[in-house]
Amino acid sequence: GSEMCKETDIIELLLANHCRDCNTCEKNGNCKLQQLAKRYDVRTVRFPNTAKTYVDDSSVSITRDASKCILCGQCVRMCNEIQSVGAIHYAHRGSHMLISTAFERPIAETVCVGCGQCAAVCPVGAITIKQDTAKVWKAIADKNLVVTAQVAPAVRVAIGKELNMPEGTDVMGKLVAAMHRMGIDKVYDTSVSADLTILEETAEFVEHLGKNTGMPLFTSCCPGWIQFAEKKHCLLYT
């Protein structure tokens, strides 16, 4: 019907302003726009491609590709309303509208904390988490290198959940075996270091409590959390 035609036209217009190189896109197979195009059987685009070809690769955490952005605004809401960071916003109006940073500076020069939540909610491949997979495979292939891996405590159950195993299944043995099969020489467990960290933090908390400073004590091993404290609440950071 006419409603179906309208939705098809909207998808076609979105694709006209979108990079259509799906084969090399990290979101290939998991892209909402790709799924909608398949659902509504949009096989051709009648309009010229006007996608903006700007890639911001300055951050150590994420990559922003303007040619894939559909201006849905989910990343803006996540960054401003949920994470309270405010690194990205809407810029300009009309056909010139885009999602950018203050003064359109590289994301590395903003208050971005590298939490990655914008990439988590992006329905297409406009914001993606940086991958070092190619570097890892290159290191494994180099016989002159000894390649080691370090596994965080939470990974032993998170991998199992990702593979649809029962909640809480410990797959550390399978994970180590798989890494050795890949060519990784040594695998280290971070659990011991985590235990030592807990002991140090407990001692620091007891000392902090004895001084009666009246200030809270926060601790985290997450780089994003630490950057958030440094950039947004610097008076609490020591």
Question: How does the language model describe each region?
Answer:
Residues 1-2, 6, 15, 130-237:
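Iron-sulfur-associated redox domains of electron-transfer enzymes in respiratory
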Residues 1-2, 6-114, 120, 127-128, ...:
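Fe-S ferredoxin-like electron-transfer domains
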Residues 22-23, 59-67, 123, 161-166, ...:
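Flexible, glycine/proline-enriched loop segments at strand-loop-helix junctions
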